[in-house]
Amino acid sequence: MTFDLRRTIEQPVLSLGAPKSRCSVETIPDRGDKEKIVEESAVQISYALDTFYFLVMGALVMFMAPGFAMLEAGLVRAKNTSEILTKNVALFAIACIMYLFIGYDLMYSGASGWLPGLDLDFGLGEDNAVADVIASDGDTYYAGFSDFFFQVVFVATAMSIISGAVAERIKLWAFLAFAVVMTGVIYPIQGSWSWGGGALSDLGFSDFAGSGIVHMCGAAAALAGVLLLGPRAGKYGANGAVHPIPGANMPLATLGMFILWFGWFGFNGGSELKLSNIEEANAVARVFVNTNMAAAGGLVAALLVAKLSFGKADLTMALNGALAGLVSITADPLSPAPGLSVLIGAIGGVLVVFSIVAFDRIKIDDPVGAISVHGVCGIWGLFAVLLSNGDATFMGQLLGTLAIFVWTFVLSLIVWSIIKAVIGIRISEEEELLGSDAADIGIEAYPEFTRG
C-alpha cells in the first residue's frame, strides 16, 4: 500500500496507532479548531508552570523555618536550646493546622471592609477544574492549593518572629497556646485588610511581600509578650546597666541567617505570583536581585555602624543587619533599582543597631533582636515603598502601618494576659536558672556542657 503524503486538511487520515484489525479513520481538525487547541494547551501549560513556580517558592519559604530555628538556637544560651527548637517545630505545625481550618477562610473571605466574612468551610474545597481554568482565559493561573501552601508558610514565619523575642523565660505551653490564636485569628484578620481585598486595599496601602503584614505583625505580637514577660534574670542591673547575655553557638546563628537569606528569595520572589511570560519572568528576576542587594547593604551597614559604635565588629549585629535589609526591601522588592535596594537595606542595617541598643536602654529584653529586625525595619520598609512606587501614598502607608500594629499589639496583649491569668506565661526563677531544657523539655541540647 502506498500513501499520498500530500493530503488536504479535509481528507481522512489513516490512524496507524490502533491494532491492524481495528484501524480507525480520523479527521484532522480545521484551522479554527487547531487554533483553539493550541490556545487551550498554552493556558494549561502556563497554569502548570505558574503552579509549579508557586509551590517551589513556597518550599523556599518553608526552608526559612529551620533558618529561624538555627538562628534562635545559636543566639540563646546552651541550657535553653532544646526548648527553643521545640517551639519552632511545634509552631510550624500549629500554624499549618489553624490556617487550614480557620485562618485561610478568614483572610480570603472576600469581604471588603475591616471585618472578614465568617462563612468558614473549615478546610479547602475542590481545586480549579480544567474547564474553568480554560474558560478564564488565563485569569486563573495557579492551583488554589498552591496558594494555600504559599500563604501558610507566611503565617508560620510571622509566628517564628515571636519565638526568639520571648526566648529563655516563657512557658512552652503558654507560647503554643498563643500560637493557636495568632495563626488562626490575629494574623489572618489583619492580612484580610490588604491581601484579602479588605479596607486597606482601597486606601493606597502597598505591601508587596509583607514588611508590615508579616514582619511588623509578628514583631507587634512579640512586643506585647515581652512587655508582660519582663526581662531575663540578670539582664539589667539596678543602676540601669545592661549585662550582655551571649548566645551559645555563633556558627549555628550564622547558618540560620544564611538559610533565611536563601529562603527570602521564595518569600519575595513568590509574591510576584506568576512566572509564565516574559514580563513576569523579568519581574521575578528583578525581585531576586533586589532582595539579595538589600541583604548585602544591611549587613555591611550594620557591621560598619557596630565597629564605629562599639570599637569592634559585632557578628550578631552583622547577622541582624542582613535580616534587617531583607525585611526593609520586602514591602517592595520590584520597583527599586538594585542600587536603591542597597540603600534601603543599608538604612535598615543602621536602624537595627540603634534600635537594639535603644530597647536595651528602656529594658525591653529581646534576646535575638527580633522586634528591632522585624518591627522597626518592617515599618521602615513600608515607608521605603514611597521612594520608588508611585502608586503608593504616604497616608495609605501610614494608615496601614497603624492599623496592623495597633490591631496586632492590642489583641496580642489581651491574649497574652488571658494566658497569663489562666496558666501563667513565665517559668519560675529556679527553672530559669536551671534552663528551659531541663524545666520544660527534659532533653538538653548540650548535656556535656550544661552539666558538670
Feature annotation, model-predicted:
Residues 4-11, 15-37:
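Short, Lys/Arg-enriched N-terminal segments with co-localized hydrophobic residues
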